Amino acid sequence: MGRVTERRKVIRIRDGAISSRPDTLVTEEPLEIRLNGKPLAITMRTPGDDFALAAGFLVSEGVLAQHSDLHNIVYCAGATADGSNTYNVVDVTTTPGTPIPDITLERNVYTTSSCGLCGKASLDAVRTTTRWPLNDTPPLHIDPDLLADLPDRLRAAQRVFDRTGGLHAAALFTEHGELLDIREDVGRHNAVDKLVGRALQNADLPLSRVILLVSGRASFELAQKAVMAGIPVLAAVSAPSSLAVDLAAETGLTLVGFLRGPSMNVYAGEHRLALETATATQT
């Protein structure tokens, strides 16, 4: 649905002057995701692209991997006591015969807009085996100068951020820097799920020759989502976590952090970057 922003009264103090004015805020509402009729998770998200979000979430969980695994996604009617539809509950039905991994039964069912899914049973439980190994053949060969341009392209494509200043963004780019898709959400993990879910709905998985760029940091969960979708390159404008770096090294994911102008840190998978012209120094 279209409830992306809301208006609220704010008291503004600037240069000693006080005024009252309406302000535009990003909407944050819960979304319950059900799998074959059974509650699975609740995430705090910005409404919009809810079906894609649910599909992308299930890709990261190893439930869905290709378009044929998905039978249907619907909003659940009667979500309130009076029977009205809040458009905050979706039910994903898998195609008969699609295997459902046990990991879906082990999670803490609450997620937040900042950290994503919390309280997994163990680290091993999150290292779900992907059906899309990172096997880009021939390997991508990306010019670092091209990567350096992507944050500005991401920022220019953010529509709601300009009005609220409160949204994260995730975008898919080709290896040549062409913007394929962008999604905004109060949670960066939701923005990634919306991208991946839309790709699944369009039968575009695996995303084997694209670059995923995220605003903010690169957490373990975002690295996992990239791997589960077959994305070979994850770049972030801020820092990665240690677990994200470990996962990238294990799976062959190219992980770039602190992507700001001509500067960047490459934490894993440097074989996909054209570093021939760079001057190598070690400390």
Name these PLM-found stretches.
Residues 156, 160-216:
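Glycine- and Gly-Pro-enriched alpha-helical subdomains that act as flexible
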Residues 189-278:
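Feature captures the catalytic cores and cofactor-binding loops of soluble hydro-lyases/lyases
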